[in-house]
Amino acid sequence: MRRHDKSNKPRSAHVRHILVGHKPEARDLIEQITNAKNPLRMFKKLAKKYSNCPSGSKKGDLGEFVEGQMAVDFETAVWATDIDQKPSKFVKTQFGYHIIWVHSKTEHQ
């Protein structure tokens, strides 16, 4: 019987995002989040109201995903973002402009 090698387990992350179609809209939402007394609460509120992604109904919650499941540029931004860091920039993919909030990350094990 072969042992499962846990050292090859891919990275994973639990994130929320807001997906919008235009750069000025993304900038405006980031400003609202940054200036809020409770940035995460504001993020959730804005995700529900403005996100073009079906996850908007879940306040932007994408749940946990493993490396390789999302668009490359999106994942690159996730791995470069600190946990629970207020978003200060957005990332552009073929789907539009994403504002990302990272709740947790696990590195390769």
Task: List each model region and its residues.
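Conserved active-site and cofactor/substrate-binding residues in soluble primary-metabolism enzymes
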Residues: 24
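Second-shell loop/turn segments in exported
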Residues: 14-18, 27-37, 61-64
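A generic "cationic amphipathic patch" detector
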Residues: 31, 59-60, 91, 109
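Proteostasis/folding factors centered on peptidyl-prolyl cis-trans isomerases
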Residues: 1-21, 49-50, 73-109
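Peptidyl-prolyl cis-trans isomerase
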Residues: 35-73
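Phosphate-binding glycine-rich loops and adjacent basic patches that engage nucleotide phosphates
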Residues: 4-11, 32-41
